[in-house]
């Protein structure tokens, strides 16, 4: 069989905007994590029985030794800010979810008792005063919690006058 080459054509490009509804299923591990946030204001992690790593958010398999994780542990609601970024422009979909005034800061937080970073918003902080290494703590929603990650409103700086 032979084919006859065709003359190349210029691609047609259509510019546009598409909005769609997305639903994320959190699975067995994620569901327990979210239920504890909603019902008890507790941040739970999964601990590896072989290498003792604690994961938040929890995962079902240890990324270090590939063991199945099934030992739930409560971790602290405070931790250390590992890094951060400031969002100054949001896409339309983000504006609906955040319902916050821009700019907004996001951080990766290593919660006390964990070995992993946890991404969340930072609040009650001047953006010019955010420092890597600063201590932060979770601020939970006081109104109806819904069983999603936004049951933690944000993480705020821990008062410097607090004794350790």
Kindly give the residue locations of the regions a language model identified.
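A broadly conserved sequence feature marking short terminus-proximal activation segments
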Residues: 2-44, 153-157
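Short metal-coordination and nucleic-acid-contact micro-motifs, chiefly zinc-binding Cys/His arrays
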Residues: 41-44, 58, 75-77
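Cys/His-enriched microdomains
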Residues: 46, 60, 131
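Cys/His-coordinated zinc-binding microdomains
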Residues: 49-52, 66
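Cys/His-rich microdomains that often coordinate metals
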Residues: 54-55, 69, 88
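Short, conserved beta-turn/loop elements at beta-strand boundaries and strand-helix junctions
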Residues: 84-90, 143
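Short, basic/aromatic beta-hairpin or loop at an interaction surface
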Residues: 103-118
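Well-ordered alpha/beta subsegment
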Residues: 115-164
């Amino acid at each position: 069989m032979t084919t006859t080459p065709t003359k190349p054509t210029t691609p047609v490009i259509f510019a546009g905007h598409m909005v769609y509804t997305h639903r994320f299923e959190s699975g067995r591990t994620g569901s327990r994590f979210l239920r504890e946030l909603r019902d008890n204001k507790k941040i739970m992690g999964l601990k590896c029985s072989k290498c003792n790593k604690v994961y938040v958010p929890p995962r079902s398999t240890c990324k270090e030794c590939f063991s199945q994780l099934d030992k739930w542990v409560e971790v602290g609601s405070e931790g250390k800010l590992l890094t951060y970024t400031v969002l100054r422009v949001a896409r339309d979909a983000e504006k609906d979810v955040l319902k916050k005034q821009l700019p907004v800061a996001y951080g990766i937080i290593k919660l006390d008792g964990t070995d992993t970073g946890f991404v969340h918003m930072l609040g009650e902080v001047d953006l010019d005063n955010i420092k890597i290494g600063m201590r932060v703590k979770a601020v939970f929603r006081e109104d109806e919690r819904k069983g999603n990650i936004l049951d933690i409103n944000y993480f705020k700086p821990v008062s410097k006058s607090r004794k350790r």
